[in-house]
């Protein structure tokens, strides 16, 4: 957080302003998504959205000259436009869709099954955000407060529930999931999610190599990866599908790393 002191005339206001995605709460995350879309639109609307993100009072905000507001926004909220969102906690754990409240995944995707991840992440890769959110946000069990177990037979019903959500909310939920995915899956499994530029993994300089096993492409999704993993273990498919997604991804990453180590020893 950055401490901001706004002084206009005899009035002063002290604010704690987030300076990275991880410091935004759910409401600010939604506003940040709106702020992004307004960059090519109305400056007035963009500045009002910025005011709501930093939580400055309207009275104080009106006292600041427009040019100074723009400079302030560029300095304080530049991370919204420049940085890729990455954080481990679910900023929007619940969302109201019509008359029902839907519950999302736990922090670090700790309650997301491999089957659920296959569906949700494949939808995300293809830009089908509403379908992805219908997988991730489901009615909660009234006794436990946890989401009801994922079932592909409930997809059409869940899509109807999510249909009540506006586009901005869907965008915020998608950004939220992708940020948690990046911090909890991508950044922890560098062999499965190889770099696009030269970098170091386990102390060795590597380059992205399309001939090596990688995370799925936009067209293929995770289904092909899953079937390749099963091989002769088809009889254990349900066990895999019900396992934690983070566990399976970590296992795939380890297999890729071990395969590379064997290749190095042979060379």
Predicted regions span which residues?
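An amphipathic, hydrophobic-aromatic interaction surface with interspersed Lys/Arg
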Residues: 1-267
């Amino acid at each position: 957080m950055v401490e901001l002191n706004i002084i206009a005339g005899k009035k002063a206001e002290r604010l704690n302003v987030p300076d990275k995605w991880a410091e935004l709460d759910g409401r600010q995350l939604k506003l940040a998504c709106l702020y992004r879309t307004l960059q090519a639109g109305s400056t007035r609307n963009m500045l009002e959205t910025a005011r709501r993100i930093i939580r400055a009072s309207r009275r104080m905000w009106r006292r600041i000259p427009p040019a100074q507001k723009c400079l302030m926004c560029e300095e304080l909220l530049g991370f919204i436009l420049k940085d890729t969102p990455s954080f481990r906690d679910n900023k929007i754990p619940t969302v109201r869709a019509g008359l029902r409240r839907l519950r999302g995944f736990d922090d670090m995707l700790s309650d997301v099954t491999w089957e659920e991840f296959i569906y949700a992440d494949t939808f995300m890769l293809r830009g089908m955000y509403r379908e992805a959110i219908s997988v991730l946000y489901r009615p909660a069990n009234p006794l436990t407060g946890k989401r009801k177990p994922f079932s592909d037979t409930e997809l059409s019903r869940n899509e109807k529930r999510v249909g009540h959500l506006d586009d901005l909310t869907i965008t915020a939920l998608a950004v939220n999931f992708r940020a948690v995915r990046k911090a909890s899956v991508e950044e922890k499994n560098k062999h499965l999610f190889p770099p696009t530029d030269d970098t170091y993994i386990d102390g060795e300089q590597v380059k992205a190599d399309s001939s090596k096993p990688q995370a799925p492409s936009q067209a293929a999704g995770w289904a092909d990866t899953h079937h390749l993993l099963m091989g002769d273990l088809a009889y254990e498919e349900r066990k895999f599908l019900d396992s934690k997604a983070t566990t399976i991804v970590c296992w795939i990453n380890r297999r890729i790393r071990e395969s590379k180590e064997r290749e190095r020893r042979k060379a």
